[in-house]
């Protein structure tokens, strides 16, 4: 069976010859216990939790972290100095009451995210090709910037299309640049493929929005290749689902 690029990344990072469910759980347990020790030492938000877990099964007895926890105590979840924070992502809550939800990232967090993105994108981004990125570009450590850096590490060329262009402008950019790969949301991709059926796109990864099966099927038919839907979250460093 073919080993995925993400599996290979984890093996290299953890110094493992191979990955099984057993050693994956051992790695997870070890990381959790090291984090719990840091929480105790630094009196972090989770400092009241046990200092050690004997098995992953014990996670079932621990409380969930809620959106309210992030809004009210997000700064207490940071286990490094303020100077070590490279990026803060803020998500406003719905309605007019309640504070914003903030997630903090260090330079090491962003580096891990780029490595994760590069491993995943290597399944469809090839050296020497171009990748059109229809994600927000908001400065150093932004989502678009992290994806672009991952594309460059694969020897490919990122096209920073962003999310503010009209479909007409995006289509013009497609014809001008001729990218082989697309990274962005599913509905804009499908709209572009319908508007310009003869574009250069042959592969795509979609994220940041739900991708219904009917949309996926039509995109795959128009691309002539498998579509890669990805679901991540701010709380897991953008990459982890």
Report the location of each language-model feature:
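Residues within well-ordered alpha helices
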Residues: 48-49, 69, 120, 150, ...
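AMP-binding/adenylate-forming
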Residues: 107-120, 130-190
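Short internal alpha-helix immediately C-terminal to a glycine-rich phosphate-binding loop
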Residues: 117-124, 195
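Nucleotide 5′-phosphate-binding alpha/beta core
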Residues: 1-92, 98-112, 119
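Short helix-loop-beta connector
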Residues: 125-129
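Gly/Ser/Thr-rich helix-start
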Residues: 96-99, 143, 233
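Active-site glycine/GP-rich loop and adjacent strand/helix microenvironment
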Residues: 1-30, 34-37, 154-241
